[in-house]
Amino acid sequence: MKKYYIGPIIEYDENGNVIYVKIHDGYESWYEYDEKRNCIHAKNSKGKEQWNEYDKNGNRIHTKDSNGYEEWNEYDENGNCIHYKNSDGYEERKRYDENGDMHYI
């Protein structure tokens, strides 16, 4: 018997956000959003989960997954990421010049 792959099954909420995906091998993902349409929680059929927090401008400032891995971001007044760090100890700082070009510090 032949199997034909016709694409994933995707469901959307009333705002057009993807809330469910199932691909041909049975892998599934579910997504939840806040009132600003930011993805605040995602989980999949393999038991992994991720939680996200955002600032008032919709920039992701914190992410944590079900394995305990975390990331933090800080932004300037223009929405540019100026500081990133993660729970593995990696950290980077950046600045942006008057042309908007990024430079590592």
What would you call each of these model-derived segments?
Residues 8-105:
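A detector of tandem-repeat and repeat-rich interaction/domain scaffolds
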Residues 4-5:
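Alpha-helical scaffold segments
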